[in-house]
Design a protein with these regions (language model features):
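Alpha-helical structural modules in large enzymes and assemblies
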Residues: 27, 31
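Electropositive polyanion-binding surfaces
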Residues: 2-8, 16, 20-22, 37-286
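Conserved beta/loop motifs at nucleotide-recognition and modification sites
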Residues: 34
Length: 286
């Protein structure tokens, strides 16, 4: 990680915070969640802990807890909303699901299982929480704090794809051919259980041969991430697409007269761009 120290503005931290608070007020950025919305979030989290998995399966969701999914996020992250499992299929395996690629019926070489945390499972339609989420729209990030879309009891707790716990998810199953083209894809509601909580640096080190992953993670994950990532980048170039890797900016007020800015690349490119925020999703979007 590269770091550079900038003396950009000589102001006490309290003044910086006050200025940011003024901006939030001017643009009506939400602050605390209304009590009614928080109460709903806490109630649905409690309900899930009691019998949520059983209710989800009874409602027709797939039991996908046999999949060795893992999450890949920055160190210390608690809002784990994506998990992935990559597989190399036996030779000439026919793809299942609706064909969406340029060559329907082509033999699949790889299978991507991609789970997205189902926050909607915890939001009663038409309730106070539903209305508040509609008002917020997205998480807003500022140098001093983030204004979350969901209450932390959900995003960091009941809905987060934490290790070794059952969670509701939208599960994509995407088959790719030997060139990395999409052969088929389907999505379904599912109950999943992450096997390991990994960091970008940890996975990149394993890809580079400079580290190992926990025994609970699939042993072929680093190699398949690099292999599939490279193929998907080739497909992107072939269709005229462009990838831009921008640094993640982390700003810390460290003293009265100094601001420290740490610029960390959003992902490492030694694996063909396979490990970067968003690129744990092996199939890119246009």
């Amino acid at each position: 990680m590269s770091r550079k120290r900038l003396s950009t503005y000589t102001a006490p931290p309290t003044e910086v915070t006050r200025a940011l608070d003024e901006l939030r007020a001017r643009y009506e950025v939400p602050t605390a969640f209304p009590p009614e919305a928080l109460a709903e979030a806490e109630a649905t989290a409690t309900s899930w802990a009691q019998d949520g998995p059983a209710r989800l399966l009874a409602d027709g969701a797939r039991d996908a807890r046999d999949l060795d999914l893992v999450t890949i996020d920055p160190p210390g992250s608690m809002d784990l909303d994506q998990a992935v499992l990559l597989e190399r299929l036996p030779a000439r395996s026919e793809a299942a699901g609706a064909s969406v690629g340029d060559a329907p019926g082509s033999a699949a070489t790889y299978r991507v299982h991609y789970a997205i945390a189902s926050l909607a499972t915890f939001v009663p339609p038409g309730g106070a929480l539903d209305a508040e989420l509609g008002r917020r729209g997205e998480t807003i990030y500022a140098p001093d704090a983030a204004t979350p879309l969901h209450p932390e009891v959900l995003s960091h707790g009941a809905a987060s794809l934490l290790e070794d716990v059952d969670r509701p998810a939208c599960l994509w199953t995407i088959d790719l051919d030997a060139r990395g083209e999409v052969v088929s894809a389907r999505v379904e509601r599912a109950l999943v259980r992450s096997r390991a909580r990994l960091s970008y640096g940890q996975v990149q080190a394993a890809i580079d041969g400079e580290g190992t992953l926990p025994s609970s993670a699939p042993t072929d994950l680093p190699g398949l991430l690099a292999e599939i990532g490279r193929l998907r980048l080739e497909r992107e170039v072939a269709r005229g697409g462009i990838s831009m890797t921008t640094p993640e900016q982390v700003i810390e007020v460290t003293a009265v007269t100094e601001t420290e800015e740490a610029a960390e690349p959003a992902g490492a490119d030694s694996a063909g761009g396979a490990v970067e925020p968003g690129a744990a999703e092996p199939v890119d979007s246009d």
